[in-house]
Amino acid sequence: MLTADGRAIIDTLPQDLHFIPKAKATKDYFEIIKEEKELDWAYFSPALQMNPSITIGRTGKYRLGTDYPVLDDEGNNMLSVEDVAVVIADEVENPKHHQIRFTAGY
């Protein structure tokens, strides 16, 4: 995802964080797949705060976005792992995103 000024969020974080190598690999994959013009693909970018410690559970209430984090009233980009599953299942059952990245948050 991108910052408000269009930079990749991953490039703005401290590079010694444990998840940086995997996050950069997914960014590289997105850069490759977005050049694909024949395949109908969708690329899901998880919320910046998405992990099992978020105990909201499954709400089914989320908002969608594309290149920028979906922020709540307090400026957080958060989604429970249960609602990530709902977002992806909803997209599979009723595709709304074609050849584009999408994300979700509360």
Annotate each language-model stretch with its function:
Residues 1-106:
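Oxidoreductase cofactor-interface core, primarily capturing Rossmann-like NAD(P)-dependent enzymes
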